Every structure is written in structure tokens, then in C-alpha cells.
Curated annotation (Swiss-Prot):
GO terms for molecular function: exodeoxyribonuclease VII activity. This is Exodeoxyribonuclease 7 small subunit. It is found in: Cytoplasm. InterPro entries: Exonuc_VII_S, Exonuc_VII_ssu_sf.
Amino acid sequence: MSKDQQSFEEMMQELENIVQKLDNETVSLEESLELYQRGMKLSATCDATLKDAEKKVNQLIKDEAEDEENGKEVNE
């Protein structure tokens, strides 16, 4: 799977690995900058994925509430 096609869980794992590497004092400045940039990209992608999931859950809850309301109206 390419980096652009990683699952949310894979991206989070890579992000955790990046944080661990950045905590390592032996990482060069150049590598630190590359890791930081990759981490920021992963963070933004994970954030967008979570927001999209939240929207879907909220829509499902709204749809369920509307279905229940419509069901009550039909039964009344």
C-alpha cells in the first residue's frame, strides 16, 4: 500500500514512529525537518479523516432520528 493509500491506523502508527524518531537526539537536522513535514502531512490527513467520519456518524444519527419521527407519524 502506498503512503497515499494508507489506512487511518497505518497513518497513526507512522505518526507515532515519527514522534519517537524526533525524540531521538541522534537524528540529524535535515532528517528532523523531513520527519516533521511528513508528520504534519499525516496529522492533517488523520484530522480530515476523523472529521469526515464524525460527519458521517452525525448524518446517520440524524437519519435515524428522522426515520423514528416519520415512523411515529405514520403510526399515529
